[in-house]
Amino acid sequence: MLVIGADTFSKVTDWNHRDCVVFGDGAGAVVLERNDRENGLFSSILLAEGEGMNEFTVFPGDAYFTMNGKAVKEKATTAVPECVREILRLNGLGLIDVSMIVPHQATLGVLKRIAEVLDIPFSRIQTNLESYANTAGATVPLLLDQVNRRGLLHTGDLLLLVSIGAGWTWGASLYRW
């Protein structure tokens, strides 16, 4: 199975707005296949609610995206930690069992707040904002590739991949490396 995440925010960004520096274009992909080993993707959850549909969107007829930064930050810093706790609970695991968290790259402030809410050191959260900014749907596969290329992944590591998107949609997966 091929999982692709890609976004081109440069096409819907107002370059005169202060939020223009937060986003970047990107694409990432992951190939998943069934195996008999004990590694790989073994649990996922996905949640959605429509109440945030106007908080981050491109409205019909508009050239640029509109974002309510306060609402986005509030949702990300509550939904992501709740999602992390839920996937761990469903699998009888704790944060102590997780080798690293590979999250959606919203902003550095959002990621730091998520670490605070989860009561973990920020060093447990992987980032690549400094290289690519927020590439939306591409952030998790891009970051996973970067972490792998840096040699930070070891056989048996438990990765927690977590993301949030417009609308609101959010989810998490557990992956044994």
Residue ranges and their predicted role:
Residues 9-12, 169-171:
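Short glycine/serine/threonine-rich phosphate/pyrophosphate-binding segments
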Residues 1-7, 157-162:
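A short, small-residue-rich loop immediately preceding and capping a beta-strand
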Residues 4-5, 51-55, 108, 137:
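Acyl-CoA/ACP chain-elongation machinery
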Residues 9, 15-78, 82-85, 164, ...:
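Condensing-enzyme catalytic core mediating Claisen C-C bond formation in acyl metabolism
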Residues 1, 25, 137:
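Active-site histidine-anchored catalytic micro-motif
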Residues 99-177:
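Claisen-condensing/thiolase-fold acyl-transfer catalytic domains that form or cleave C-C bonds
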Residues 15, 58-99, 109-119, 143, ...:
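Conserved active-site "lid/cap" helical segment
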